[in-house]
Regions:
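Glycine-rich, proline-tolerant flexible connector loops at the mouths of alpha/beta enzymes
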Residues: 46-64, 104, 166-176
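Short, acidic/polar
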Residues: 28-40, 84-90, 145-155, 206
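Conserved anion-binding
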Residues: 11-12, 19-23, 90-93, 97-172
């Protein structure tokens, strides 16, 4: 299982939101590169970067910071937030990211997933499925749709997306543990890579995730920033 520390960017700063609410924002740093290097040194396999300004508005606002992060680390980076057109996806790749994450666009126009996969390669396309009570939320989680999360996951896999990132909104930033039941359901449905996001609170959560058969990766956010998980990430899951 690969480990992906999260770097959420807003106005060029590293922030964390509780349940995706902009009103519940904590600013951790004005130096994203320093955190990127810190997580790389801690044993991260990838970095999971989200442009929150773009997620809320649809317009990328933090590509300069993203490019600096990609240039500063040796591990690959993925980027989500505002990836709603070929031009914006290409700009992300030009900034140095290895994989982009489709969210709102994938839900609102699932037929576009296959086109993006054909143009850029399915291994470079992830679909982020942010679930609120089993339904997909979009536009920075400000709107919950009627789309069933598992249906979108299957459609994305069929369209050629190499990776699905499943976020349980109710657990995100709450430090109460991942939604293991929903992850098991997703794993039973999918053959492509599945990354778990939301709720990781301690070493034991990481160990339990690492023991889930077929789980490709786990994103870690608030638990790292708040010091609930310390030490080398690889060593933590090796001890599982």
């Amino acid at each position: 299982m690969i480990l992906l520390p999260a770097i959420d960017l807003m106005g060029g700063e590293v922030v964390r939101l509780r349940r995706g609410l902009a009103t519940e924002k904590v600013v951790y740093s004005s130096d994203p590169v320093a955190f990127a290097k810190k997580w790389e040194d801690s044993g991260a396999d990838w970095l999971h970067i989200v442009d929150l300004d773009a997620a809320f508005t649809g317009e990328p606002r933090n590509l300069d910071s993203v490019a600096k992060i990609c240039a500063a680390v040796k591990i690959p980076c993925e980027l989500g937030g505002g990836m709603r057109s070929e031009e914006k996806i290409q700009a992300a790749f030009d900034a140095g990211v290895a994989r982009v994450i489709l969210g709102t666009k994938a839900c609102q126009s699932p037929e576009t997933i296959a086109g993006f996969c054909a143009k850029f390669g399915g291994e470079r396309i992830a679909v982020g499925i942010d679930a609120n009570g089993g339904k997909v939320a979009v536009k920075g989680w400000t709107e919950t749709t009627a789309t069933v999360a598992s249906d979108l996951a299957l459609a994305a896999q069929k369209a050629g997306a190499g990776t699905i990132i499943y976020t349980d909104i109710a657990t995100d930033g709450m430090l109460e543990g991942p939604n293991f039941a929903e992850l098991e359901k997703m794993l039973s449905l999918l053959d492509c890579n599945l990354i778990a996001s939301g709720g990781v609170s301690c070493d034991e959560d990481l160990k339990r995730l690492s023991l889930m058969p077929g789980l490709y990766g786990a994103i870690i956010g608030k638990a790292l920033y708040d010091g609930r998980i310390t030490g080398n990430l690889r060593e933590i899951i090796a001890a599982a």
